[in-house]
Amino acid sequence: NPQHAVLKGSKIIKGTWEKYKDDIMQIRTGQEISPYAQLYIDGIEMVLARYPNYDSTISHYNGYAADAIDPARVKHWKNPEGAIVHAMHRGEWGGFHYIVEDSNKKGKVTLSGGHQNNRPSPMHEEYRMVENVFEELDAPGEWYFDSSKSILYVYPYENMVLTNALVEYTALNHLIEIKGSSDDAISDINLKGLRFQHTNRTFMETYEPLLRSDWMIYRGAAVFLENTEDCNIMDCEFTNLGGNAIFASGYNRNLNIEGNHIYNCGASAVCFVGLPDAVRSPSYNYHEFIDFKEIDTTKGPKTRDYPVKCKVNNNLIHNIGLVEKQTAGVQISMAMNITVSHNSIYDVPRAGINISEGTWGGHIIEYNDVFNTVLASSDHGAFNSWGRDRFWHPDRKTMDQITKDNPMMPYLDAIQTTIIRNNRMRCDHGWDIDLDDGSSNYHLYNNLCLNGGIKLREGFYRTVENNIMLNNGFHPHVWFQNSGDVFIKNIVMTDHKDIRLQGWGKEVDYNLFPNMAALEQAKNNGTDEHSAF
């Protein structure tokens, strides 16, 4: 929109271009360009020199190679220090990012980083990419900055003329911060009709765990809000951002995010993340737990430092997570009563919408079109959630006993029911709707699932009714003996894909199957007495 006022976090490079060698050009900048910066020439994003070369048709890192940091390759780099390594989690549960600190004579590198994922693992053996290496400056569109000489090298695209071109590099992590104080919230700030672009990649900043979910997150974005009330972000464009686009941190009330176009971003589009101080008896890793005798059994949050009654409505979100892979179109953690409605979310590496834990529920996810999801990862959902709340324990036998003795404990954190209704969902490498570890107190109805079906894993009190699952069906995984789950009046296209159940919940019945064999198998499990095909 030519009417948009533009807010950029970039600086301009001016000078005279000279030939370096072959097709590579150079310019003396007199300015420092961070390896976490993004470079644009006449508005075209350039590619930091990398191996393997950039290929837009490849989902994982736009090109990957098992030998990205093999000693045989590293030995040919004059100065490996400062190279950036990106690698997927071995289970493809997001990714990691590292910096090469040093290398020995044999080409073995020493790395720092890898702190961006709350489920640590070795690097994926195949899905790896390395960048910021001068010797890998070998393809059109690539660039490299030599900080020791203050020289920028560019291998221009075909027909790209550098003389008099506008050369910009990002220099900021945030563009606007709206921050009140804990005792004096800032209110009634409206951002409308603005274009936000050009921020740094933030994957090596400080990350924090989102309780026991798989996520670590950088608490920052192009637009960052904290301690706000009744603010609006409307009809804006967010593009060419290295990290998150919008981040509501801690206390936020009645924030409205509506009618925005968010695309070409390195991390997540919209994040609602409360402060962990608001959580009772928090744990911060999958394997971490608090002894039951020491758990605070008071229901609900401890403070008010979390987002409440915020809306994400009628936004177009696509092509995000271009750098970081544990990302989402809308991310919710330690928040309550968030409404996500009428959004189109697609072309994302992981979930379109993610809820990290049960704290504190009451969300409404409705009328969203979420597709082309989990494109560069695995074992996830177009909608994904976890629920490793106070009742949850990494040892299943211990958790069985805790929940048997305290059947209402899942409601301590998931104090309100989260509703998922009237959505169209499609997942490429997982489930269309994935209520994973511990997700509790959900009501799913009137959803159209196009590819991956619906999965419910080891949680409590989920009701799933009147949904259509095309090309797939129902996936109940490792249910508790008395989970209280209900699965009724749904249309499925396969038999039930149960795994290690201790029981079949409160009710599984009145469903429509594709054929007699699938129905008979369900009846043999003691379910679907009144179902048909």
Question: Where does each model-flagged region fall?
Answer:
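Extracellular polysaccharide-degrading/modifying enzymes targeting complex plant/algal/animal polysaccharides
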Residues: 1-227, 232-239, 278-302, 533
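Glycine-rich beta-solenoid repeat tracts in large extracellular/virion proteins
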Residues: 5-10, 88, 174-183, 203-204, ...
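Short intrinsically disordered coil segments
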Residues: 14, 168-170, 330, 398-401, ...
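Aromatic- and carboxylate-lined catalytic core of secreted/periplasmic carbohydrate-active enzymes
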Residues: 44, 55, 509-510, 514-533
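Glycine/Thr-rich phosphate-binding loops of Rossmann-like dinucleotide-binding domains
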Residues: 119, 280, 393, 521-522
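Extended interaction regions within the primary functional domain
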Residues: 134, 158, 173-179, 397, ...
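Right-handed parallel beta-helix
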Residues: 187-198, 229-243, 252-267, 276-298, ...
